Each structure stands twice: as structure tokens, then as C-alpha cells.
Swiss-Prot record:
Spans within the Extracellular topological domain: 24-235
Descriptive protein name: Interferon gamma receptor 1
Fibronectin type-III domain residues: 26-117
Bilayer disposition of the protein: Single-pass type I membrane protein
UniProtKB keywords: Cell membrane, Glycoprotein, Membrane, Receptor, Signal, Transmembrane, Transmembrane helix
Bilayer-spanning residue ranges: 236-256
Residue ranges that the UniProt entry lists as topological domain Cytoplasmic: 257-377
Induction remark: Up-regulated in response to ifng1 (interferon gamma 1), tgfb1b (TGF-beta), and tnfb (TNF-alpha 2).
Organism, scientific name: Carassius auratus
Gene Ontology MF term list: cytokine receptor activity
Length: 377
């Protein structure tokens, strides 16, 4: 009987001690996760009871080593410095709560990796920098900062040995352009994309990787016209060139013409000395012509009597012999055939001008004609 009572009391004491120990035990952190990007890796967790005397400690373990962090009161911690060979390893993260001298059990582990071929809960990817788009020669020019320079201090690019390989897909994957960007050669990565047709908006998708580290796809669009238009200067410069050439040639021709004309003026007089000799009539000033009337002396003078009636009465009484004498005297004064000759000469020359003498006149050197007019003094 006493033995049974002793056993019952012992079991009761043990149960009480167990309940006291469970009440004193520190609870473990919950919902452990990892957030990783191009700049680093951060572990996060949750804790049901937050006290000022509670600290947390993060443990990172890879396939070869295990590292513990310093204690922190925050519910997150940057663990980038605790990663070794992030390009190939995968990491297991656990968090332990510490209060006083007591530690909680480790939390559930969380596995992550930057290696796209590793088996992990989460695979960390890199992000492309901001992309600059501009039209160039009828194509869409794509340019962005080289990630090998931009992320050179991040854990993802630690112990780097590979180059960046990226591809641009257009027209819903129908066209694809791939390029390589190196750290030593390029401060920026750039290429040109060709589109099958012209449109108001040009979109494409950018993907890439550095070894086994992959980049998150990035989509970009350019709104505008990328077609190439010939600048105005392409037509202006040839036209100016042709115009200046023609002006230059024209100037040379004018100078040569002036020179030839001056030389010809010097040589022609010596080659043709009498070419410009038009005779004395052309070399002297014209003379003034003076008209001199011929003196005509009357051979017969008739005196009027005082009474015309008396004179007329005397005429019929005059003797015919006297009239014949007068007629013969007047006829003898002109000569026997003077009137006949003058009349015949005038008719033969088709010009009835007995009062204008006929003379020779020189119209040009060596060319003389018959003319009628006053005599030259």
C-alpha cells in the first residue's frame, strides 16, 4: 500500500516538473523565408512572443561549410556575407531564438540558391538595369548598363568568371537577337533590333544569364517612328558642290575668254594690217558742201515801153525780117545744136535736171557712182 502511494507521488512530481520545464522552454521562430535580388540576400522570420530579452541567431549551411551569424533583435538579417560560392551552392537557413541562457529549437529550414539547376525552394534571379531605347538607322537601339559592373559587389557575382549573355525577342518570339557583354570590354551593353514591319509601338522581351545565374525577363516598349529618313543635308551638300563647281568652271571660262580677246586684239592688226583701212573718206572728218548757183547771163534784153498798148500795136507792124533777125540772133547766141544735145543727154540719163551738173561720187573705197547735185568746193 505504501509502495503504491510512493509511486503515485513520484509520477505526480515528475509531471509537475515536466509542465514547469515546458512553460520555461523558449519557442522557436516561425515562417522563415529568404528574399534575394541583384544586390544581396536577406532572411526573414516571425516570432509569436516578442520580448526585449529575446535574441535571434541565423545559421547558414551549404554543402561544405556551416556559418552562424551574430545575434540580432530584428526579425530579418542580411546574410550576403555568409554565402560561399553562391553561383553553384545551395543554402539551408535556420533561425534559433535565445532568451537568457535558453535556446529554442531551430526553426524549419529554408533552402535557396542562385543556381538555376539546383533543387531549392526558391531560385534567386538577377534584374536587368534600366533600358534606354532610341531609333537608329531604321532599327530600335537598345542600351543598358553592364550588370557585371553594376552588381560587382553583390553575392550573386562573387567569384565571377563568366560573361553576360542576353537575348532580345521581338514579334512574339519570331525574331531573336543574342549578344555577349564582357566586364573588361564593355561599360554598357547595346545592340540594335530589327522589326518585320513598321508600327506605332515597338515592344520586345529581354532575357539573359551569367553562367548558371539567370536574369528575370524584362519587357520594354518604344512608342514612335524608327524609320530612317534621309536628312536634308544629303541633298544640300551635293547641290552646293555642283553649284560651286559650275561657278568655278564659269569663272575660269570668263577669265580665259578675256585673255584670248586681249591677245586677239593685239595679234589681229599685225596679221591683217589693211583689214580696218577704209580709205581717206573714213579717216577724215566730213567736209561741208556749198551749193553755188550757175551764173546765167541774159542774151536778150527786152525793154518795156511806156505804153503797153502802143507796143502791142507796133508788133504786128514790124517787119518779118526783123523778127527773123532777132530769132536768128538769139539762136546764134546758144549755138546751133545746144538745146538738142542737152535734151538728148537729159533723156538718155533718165533725169531731167539740166540745172544740176553730173559728177562722180565715191560711196566707199574703190566704189564710185554717177550723181547729180551741187558741186563740191
Amino acid at each position: 500500500m505504501r509502495t503504491q502511494i510512493y509511486i503515485s507521488v513520484t509520477v505526480l512530481i515528475l509531471l509537475l516538473k515536466k509542465s514547469d520545464l515546458e512553460a520555461v522552454r523558449v519557442p522557436s521562430p516561425e515562417s522563415v523565408s529568404v528574399q534575394c535580388d541583384s544586390y544581396g540576400v536577406e532572411a526573414r522570420w516571425e516570432y509569436p512572443e516578442v520580448h526585449q530579452d529575446v535574441y535571434f541567431q541565423v545559421k547558414v549551411k551549404d554543402e561544405f561549410t556551416e556559418r552562424d551569424s551574430s545575434r540580432t533583435k530584428n526579425l530579418h538579417l542580411n546574410i550576403s556575407s555568409m554565402l560561399f560560392r553562391p553561383a553553384y551552392n545551395r543554402y539551408c537557413v535556420t533561425v534559433t531564438a535565445v532568451r537568457g541562457g535558453e535556446k529554442s529549437d531551430p526553426s524549419d529550414f529554408f533552402i535557396f540558391s542562385f543556381n538555376e539547376n539546383a533543387a531549392a525552394y526558391i531560385k534567386c534571379s538577377l534584374d536587368f538595369p534600366e533600358v534606354e531605347l532610341s531609333p537608329k538607322d531604321g532599327r530600335l537601339h537598345v542600351q543598358f548598363t553592364n550588370p557585371l559592373h553594376l552588381y560587382r559587389n553583390s553575392p550573386a557575382l562573387r567569384d565571377l568568371s563568366e560573361d553576360l549573355k542576353y537575348c532580345i525577342e521581338t514579334d512574339q518570339g519570331k525574331n531573336k537577337v543574342c549578344e555577349t557583354c564582357q566586364m573588361k570590354q564593355n561599360a554598357s551593353c547595346e545592340t540594335s533590333v530589327v522589326f518585320s514591319e513598321h508600327r506605332g509601338e515597338y515592344c520586345f522581351s529581354l532575357t539573359g544569364n551569367i553562367g548558371q545565374r539567370i536574369f528575370n525577363p524584362r519587357s520594354s516598349c518604344f512608342t514612335g517612328d524608327i524609320r530612317r529618313y534621309t536628312p536634308f543635308t544629303v541633298y544640300l551638300y551635293p547641290v552646293l558642290g555642283v553649284t560651286l563647281t559650275l561657278l568655278f568652271i564659269t569663272g575660269i571660262i570668263i577669265l580665259l575668254e578675256k585673255k584670248c580677246n586681249s591677245e586677239m586684239k593685239k595679234k589681229v592688226p599685225s596679221m591683217f594690217p589693211h583689214f580696218f583701212d577704209f580709205g581717206e573718206t573714213q579717216s577724215h572728218l566730213p567736209k561741208t558742201l556749198c551749193v553755188v548757183a550757175d551764173k546765167v547771163e541774159p542774151h536778150l534784153q527786152i525793154e518795156l515801153v511806156e505804153d503797153p498798148e502802143e507796143q502791142t500795136s507796133l508788133v504786128p507792124l514790124s517787119d518779118n525780117k526783123d523778127l527773123e533777125g532777132v530769132y536768128s540772133e538769139d539762136k546764134n547766141s546758144y549755138g546751133p545744136n545746144d538745146l538738142v544735145e542737152d535734151e538728148q543727154s537729159d533723156l538718155s540719163d533718165f533725169y531731167d535736171c539740166p540745172h544740176a551738173p553730173k559728177q562722180k561720187r565715191e560711196m566707199s573705197p574703190g566704189d564710185t557712182v554717177d550723181s547729180y547735185g551741187p558741186r563740191l568746193l
